[in-house]
Amino acid sequence: MPVQGSQRRLLGSLNSTPTAPPHLGLAANQTGTRCLEVSIPDGLFLSLGLVSLVENVLVVTAIAKNRNLHSPMYCFICCLALSDLLVSGSNMLETAVILLLEAGALAARAAVVQQLDNVIDVITCSSMLSSLCFLGAIAVDRYISIFYALRYHSIVTLPRARRAVAAIWVASVLFSMLFIAYYDHAAVLLCLVVFFLAMLVLMAVLYIHMLARACQHAQGIARLHKRQCPAHQGFGLKGAATLTILLGIFFLCWGPFFLHLTLIVLCPQHPTCSCIFKNFNLFLALIICNAIIDPLIYAFRSQELRRTLKEVLLCSW
């Protein structure tokens, strides 16, 4: 699998940043650039992947088992869990293969290893893209349920949700294959960065608008009951805190990875950017952390899903 320095993990094409001239390391030393490289032990990487894998398998199983959860909203949540499951699983697979190759326990020709790496890269990239898409789809679904409540069930139907899911998966696979094939083209990397920023803006605008509507609704209820202003202010602060956490986690977990892509285009050979490239494994670990957090935010808050999950766990014993 393509490697560069300590960057040994998925998306080997991304790890193969533009080759620096021979004097780059010397230049970095001359300028006194000090690199802060956060090493991610293989055990920690595998542990994070395993936790995410178990969490998201439970979410998919619970939604599949309970027919009451076969609605458009849970369809998107289930697909988000499946995407996160693939992100974690593919990372665990490549880490395990690398460890086996390094230990000499697995013997394979270079061509076979390269083909395996390409397959894993496509799975990882497509699952990342689909994960971002389903986060956006969940935001749109919630927005429609609030602002078009009376027409929600006629607008967001299960067949339409299934078509949207199919379109997201197909587009994610196609774009990931395109990305892996043309990873060394700046335009492809910039398209991925623009896509991330578009999802971030979409989610921020929709959730802020939903928060504003919720605050207006709470203010109206307070007026009807002749309550004082502090109650409404407390609700607004709580909603703002929730929104900050939701968007903050999204940005902190995904932002560094797309910053990495941006810097590959802008300054592939600059010493400071080279220092950031050394933390590619950390950026992947943050994405896996997001896959761990997603079920806590979008799935496990549902009482119906928690009840089904409890039944599944009890039946398994």
From Swiss-Prot:
Glycans are attached at residue 29. Residues 64-72, 141-163, 212-240, 301-317 are cytoplasmic. GO terms for cellular component: plasma membrane. The chain crosses the membrane at residues 38-63, 73-93, 119-140, 164-183, 192-211, 241-266, 280-300. It is a multi-pass membrane protein. One of its GO terms (molecular function) is melanocyte-stimulating hormone receptor activity. SMART domains: 7TM_GPCR_Srsx. GO terms for biological process: adenylate cyclase-activating G protein-coupled receptor signaling pathway. A lipid is attached at residue 315 (S-palmitoyl cysteine). Interacts with MGRN1, but does not undergo MGRN1-mediated ubiquitination; this interaction competes with GNAS-binding and thus inhibits agonist-induced cAMP production. Interacts with OPN3; the interaction results in a decrease in MC1R-mediated cAMP signaling and ultimately a decrease in melanin production in melanocytes. Receptor for MSH (alpha, beta and gamma) and ACTH. The activity of this receptor is mediated by G proteins which activate adenylate cyclase. Mediates melanogenesis, the production of eumelanin (black/brown) and phaeomelanin (red/yellow), via regulation of cAMP signaling in melanocytes. This is Melanocyte-stimulating hormone receptor. It comes from Cercopithecus neglectus. The lineage of its organism: Eukaryota, Metazoa, Chordata, Craniata, Vertebrata. The gene is MC1R.
